[in-house]
A protein has these predicted regions:
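Single conserved hydrophobic/aromatic residue that forms the stacking wall/gate
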Residues: 1-5, 9
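Juxtamembrane membrane-interface segments at transmembrane alpha-helix termini
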Residues: 61-70, 86-93, 113-117
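A cytosolic-side transmembrane-helix exit/cap motif
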Residues: 66-77, 94-100, 120-131
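Transmembrane helix-loop-helix
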Residues: 26-70, 149-177
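Membrane-water interface of alpha-helical transmembrane segments
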Residues: 18-25, 41, 45-48, 97-104, ...
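C-terminal membrane-associated helical module and adjoining short loops/tails
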Residues: 103-177
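Interhelical loop and helix-boundary elements at the membrane-water interface
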Residues: 13-25, 61-80, 133-145
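Hydrophobic alpha-helical transmembrane segments in multi-pass integral membrane proteins
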Residues: 86-96, 154-161
Length: 177
């Protein structure tokens, strides 16, 4: 199905035809090269590798394949959106440690209960587009149950930084509110 067929996508420059695929690829390549060069210059190779993984995972694996292949698309694809705390941490510390990984987990678990209400609200647009979002593939009732499950897991994961001794009482109180 053409992305231009849906209200969700028709205003995007590629779908509307305002930008050609070749021009988009050239512009993306320039930004990728410049951004990667700056990332490496101002931080380190570990940060560049994690950032590159996130870029490839989102732009190729999620956007081209997962989005169209599985109702778990935003769950799996949410990994790339959860990486910024790890990227920021490695830019400063040049190491991977438990605290930023718990933050990645928190954002990862936050994504489904955050996004699925939008998918429910726009279910007709996703149906028209042929995107197998959870509410379409498994039904709205099942999606709501999974949202609650993810919210419970999210609450538990939000306590992890305190329970592992990575943060103090202020974090625990603010997280529990």
């Amino acid at each position: 199905t053409s992305s231009a067929a849906s209200d969700v996508y028709k205003r995007q420059p590629l779908a509307s035809g305002n930008i050609t695929l070749l021009n988009a690829l050239i512009f993306t390549s320039i930004l990728l090269f410049l951004g990667s060069s700056l990332m490496l210059y101002f931080s380190n190779i570990l940060t560049l590798l994690i950032t590159t993984f996130g870029f490839i995972f989102y732009s190729l694996i999620y956007t081209i394949y997962l989005k169209w292949a599985t109702p778990q698309n935003i769950v799996i694809g949410g990994l790339s959106g959860a990486l910024p705390p790890l990227i920021g941490w490695t830019a400063v510390a040049n190491e991977i440690s438990l605290l930023p990984l718990t933050l990645v987990l928190i954002i990862f678990l936050w994504t489904p209960p955050h996004f699925w209400p939008l998918a429910i609200d726009r279910i007709d647009e996703y149906k028209k587009e042929g995107v197998p979002m959870m509410p379409i593939a498994k039904g709205v009732a099942r999606t709501k149950i999974e949202m609650v499950i993810y919210a419970v897991l999210l609450f538990g994961a939000s306590l992890a930084p305190f329970l592992y001794g990575l943060t103090g009482i202020f974090y625990l109180v603010s997280t529990s509110l």
